C-alpha cells in the first residue's frame, strides 16, 4: 500500500479530472514562460532512474528540472544497487532523505508501488510495461493547442481520439485511462489477440463514467470515422523484439496512412509518441504530412512534465 501522506503520479487515474486540467493549464503557462515557476524555495534535487533506455524521457526531464531551478541525479540500473538485494521499500525510504522527488522509468508497475510504500517524496511514473502517463499529459497538451486553444482542457470533452495498432501495450492502456479522464471519447482499434486487457478497459470506463466519455475497443476500421485525433505506436514495444510473436502481419491493415486519415474528420491531427517506423505503423506521407503534430507532441513532454512536478510538489498533503 502506498504511503497515504504522499501524492504520487504512478498511473493516469492518480489525477482527478479537475487535477489533470490544472496540470494541463500549468503546462501551457510554462510553455509560454519556461521560467514562470519555482516549486520550492529550498533545493530541488530529483532522482531520475532508468531501468529502460530513453531519449525523450531523459532529455525532457533533465531539461525541465533545470528550468525549475533544480538538479537531476540520473542513475541507470547498471550503476546502483536497486534490485540487487536491497528492497525497493528501503530504497524509497533512503532516496527520500536525499531528494525532493523521484522519477522512474522501469519495467513492472509493482516496482513503483513497492517503492511508494515508504517514499516520503512524490514518485513519477516515467514509463512501465503497463502505463506511460507522462506521455498522455503531453499528448493532451498538444490536443488542447490544436483543438481547444480558447477553451483549454475543458474543450476536450466530447472530442474523439482513435488509436490503431497494438492495443495490448502501455500506450493503449494510458490513452484509455488518461483520455477518459479528460472527457474524451477514446477508441482502441486493434486486431483480435492484441486488444487491451480487461482490467485496463474497466479502469478507463470507471473514469469515463465520471466525465461522460466513452471507451470503445474494436477491430473495425470504420471506428475511425469522426475522429479528431488519430494515434498509433510502434508495433514492437521495447522488450518484445524476441518474444516469438508475429507483430507485423496482424497489424498491416491498421497502418495509419492517407486512406485511414481520410476516414477521420477533415481537420484531424496525427500523434505518435516516437520513435516511429515509417512504412510500418505509419506511412511517411502521414507522419511527415500536414496533419502530423509529432514534434510538438515530443516538445510538450518537457512542458507537461515540468507542470506535473510543480503540481505534485505544491499539492502534497499536510
UniProtKB/Swiss-Prot annotation:
Keywords: Amino-acid biosynthesis, Arginine biosynthesis, Cytoplasm, Transferase. Its EC number is 2.1.3.3. Gene3D superfamilies: Aspartate/ornithine carbamoyltransferase. One of its GO terms (biological process) is arginine biosynthetic process via ornithine. Pathway: Amino-acid biosynthesis; L-arginine biosynthesis; L-arginine from L-ornithine and carbamoyl phosphate: step 1/3. One of its GO terms (molecular function) is ornithine carbamoyltransferase activity. Pfam families: OTCace, OTCace_N. PROSITE patterns: CARBAMOYLTRANSFERASE. GO terms for cellular component: cytoplasm. Its main location: cytoplasm. It catalyses: carbamoyl phosphate + L-ornithine = L-citrulline + phosphate + H(+). SUPFAM superfamilies: Aspartate/ornithine carbamoyltransferase. It is found in: Cytoplasm. L-ornithine binds at residues 170, 233, 237-238. Carbamoyl phosphate binds at residues 54-57, 81, 105, 132-135, 273-274, 301. It is an enzyme of class 2 (transferase). Reversibly catalyzes the transfer of the carbamoyl group from carbamoyl phosphate (CP) to the N(epsilon) atom of ornithine (ORN) to produce L-citrulline. HAMAP family: OTCase (MF_01109). Belongs to the aspartate/ornithine carbamoyltransferase superfamily. OTCase family. NCBIfam families: orni_carb_tr, PRK00779.1. This is Ornithine carbamoyltransferase. It comes from Corynebacterium efficiens (strain DSM 44549 / YS-314 / AJ 12310 / JCM 11189 / NBRC 100395). The gene is argF.
Amino acid at each position: 500500500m502506498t504511503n497515504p501522506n504522499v501524492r504520487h503520479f504512478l498511473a493516469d487515474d492518480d489525477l482527478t479530472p479537475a487535477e489533470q486540467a490544472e496540470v494541463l493549464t500549468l503546462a501551457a503557462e510554462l510553455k509560454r514562460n519556461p521560467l514562470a515557476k519555482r516549486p520550492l524555495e529550498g533545493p530541488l534535487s530529483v532522482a531520475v532512474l532508468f531501468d529502460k533506455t530513453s531519449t525523450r524521457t531523459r532529455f525532457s526531464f533533465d531539461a525541465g528540472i533545470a528550468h525549475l531551478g533544480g538538479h537531476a541525479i540520473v542513475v541507470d540500473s547498471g550503476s546502483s544497487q536497486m534490485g540487487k538485494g536491497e528492497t525497493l521499500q528501503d530504497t524509497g525510504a533512503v532516496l527520500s532523505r536525499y531528494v525532493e522527488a523521484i522519477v522512474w522509468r522501469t519495467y513492472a508497475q509493482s516496482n513503483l508501488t513497492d517503492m511508494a510504500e515508504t517514499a516520503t517524496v512524490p514518485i513519477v511514473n516515467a514509463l512501465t510495461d503497463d502505463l506511460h502517463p507522462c506521455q498522455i499529459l503531453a499528448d493532451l497538451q498538444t490536443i488542447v493547442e490544436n483543438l481547444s486553444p480558447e477553451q483549454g482542457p475543458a474543450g476536450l470533452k466530447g472530442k474523439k481520439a482513435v488509436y490503431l495498432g497494438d492495443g495490448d501495450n502501455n500506450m493503449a492502456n494510458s490513452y484509455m485511462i488518461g483520455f477518459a479522464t479528460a472527457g474524451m471519447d477514446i477508441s482502441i482499434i486493434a486486431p483480435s489477440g492484441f486488444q487491451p486487457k480487461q482490467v485496463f478497459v474497466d479502469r478507463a470506463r470507471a473514469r469515463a463514467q465520471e466525465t461522460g466519455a466513452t471507451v470503445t475497443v474494436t477491430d473495425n476500421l470504420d471506428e475511425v470515422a469522426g475522429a479528431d485525433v488519430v494515434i498509433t505506436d510502434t508495433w514492437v514495444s521495447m522488450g518484445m523484439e524476441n518474444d516469438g510473436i508475429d507483430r507485423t502481419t496482424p497489424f498491416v491493415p491498421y497502418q495509419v496512412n492517407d486512406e485511414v486519415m481520410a476516414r477521420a474528420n477533415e481537420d484531424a491531427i496525427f500523434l505518435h509518441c516516437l520513435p516511429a517506423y515509417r512504412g510500418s505503423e505509419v506511412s511517411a506521407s502521414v507522419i511527415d504530412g500536414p496533419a502530423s503534430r509529432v514534434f510538438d507532441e515530443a516538445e510538450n513532454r518537457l512542458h507537461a512534465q515540468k507542470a506535473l512536478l510543480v503540481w505534485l510538489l505544491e499539492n502534497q498533503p499536510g
